[in-house]
Amino acid sequence: MTHLNAFSSVEHSTVLLHETVDGLALKENGIYIDGTFGRGGHSRLILSKLSANGKLIAIDRDPKAVAEAQKIQDPRFQIEHNTFSEILSICEKRGLVGKIDGILLDLGVSSPQLDDAARGFSFMKDGPLDMRMDDSKGISAAEWLQQVSEQDLAWVLKTFGEERFAKKIAKAIVNYNKSAVQNGSEFLTRTLQLAELIAHTVPFKDKHKHPATRSFQAIRIFINAELDELEKVLQSALTVLAPAGRLSVISFHSLEDRMVKHFMRKQSQGREIPKGLPLREDQIQRNQTLKVIGKAIMPTDAEIAQNPRARSAVLRVAERLN
């Protein structure tokens, strides 16, 4: 059963599309989860490889992504409006714990989210300073910046953006909003306002990287609790995957990739055994839960030339052990 035409329109923009799906080692009758539907590039390719008995559950917290997924009329496909950290409860209500043959995660912000100025993710387009992946929940970036302390903001910029000018930028943002209160002027509410403030605050040395890049990343990660969500889904994957089930994860910045790499490595090594114990190798129960499959995969030069956003992508794959 093929659906090649269904995904051809998004194939060009989905990073490491075939490599990520290949990492799942698809079984045509298997049960799979696409934890980040986005605009459906991975989901449509997975469906094209499944038989009539296969199943795919997609998850996305973005209402626009869910609306896109609802256009897929396929009895093998279901969409969940949720965060992927809830993967365990999603499987529990379907009786699928320990029965999932593969989980795919394409982390970070999607191209449609970046390209839509109204979402507030981009420092290149003017829009409301929102940055929520699900704009029906939580507070916007603008609202948070109006109430955060200089110290806490600096911590977020440093921790989630690895921004070396974190203190300087935090001071400028907090002072801007304080003066808005005193003068009765407008708070930071627009993306370009924030981007320009940062550009005027720090040295602009790297021609290829906007000075607001790291700050926007840090604020977005914090607003959406992205690293907390990632930690939860990785742990839950161990419970919901079937033996030999695959976990295929694309990350786009070093914080995500370090978390994924460390998790897979730790689970593949199992628990440490103190040196000097009088045990034979066959007596040692290390309790490894994953096997790392191959080395990390990066996009080719050709893919990066076609889609510059692929530049920082890293794909890692692991397999659930019995």
Swiss-Prot record:
What HAMAP family does the record tag this protein with?
16SrRNA_methyltr_H (MF_01007)
* GO MF: rRNA (cytosine-N4-)-methyltransferase activity
Q: Which GO terms describe its cellular component?
A: cytoplasm
Q: What is this protein called?
A: Ribosomal RNA small subunit methyltransferase H
What lineage does UniProt assign to this protein's organism?
Bacteria, Pseudomonadati, Pseudomonadota, Gammaproteobacteria, Pasteurellales
Provide the residue positions that the database annotates as binding S-adenosyl-L-methionine.
40-42, 60, 84, 106, 113
The entry's keywords: Cytoplasm, Methyltransferase, rRNA processing, S-adenosyl-L-methionine, Transferase
* Main function: Specifically methylates the N4 position of cytidine in position 1402 (C1402) of 16S rRNA.
- EC number(s)? 2.1.1.199
Q: Which family does it belong to?
A: Belongs to the methyltransferase superfamily. RsmH family.
* Source organism, top-level taxon: Bacteria
Organism the protein comes from: Aggregatibacter aphrophilus (strain NJ8700) (Haemophilus aphrophilus)
Q: Which reaction(s) does its UniProt entry say it catalyses?
A: cytidine(1402) in 16S rRNA + S-adenosyl-L-methionine = N(4)-methylcytidine(1402) in 16S rRNA + S-adenosyl-L-homocysteine + H(+)
Where it sits in the cell: the answer is:
Cytoplasm
- Name the principal localization, coarsely classed: cytoplasm
Keyword Signal (UniProt):
no
Quick check: keyword Signal in the entry?
A: no
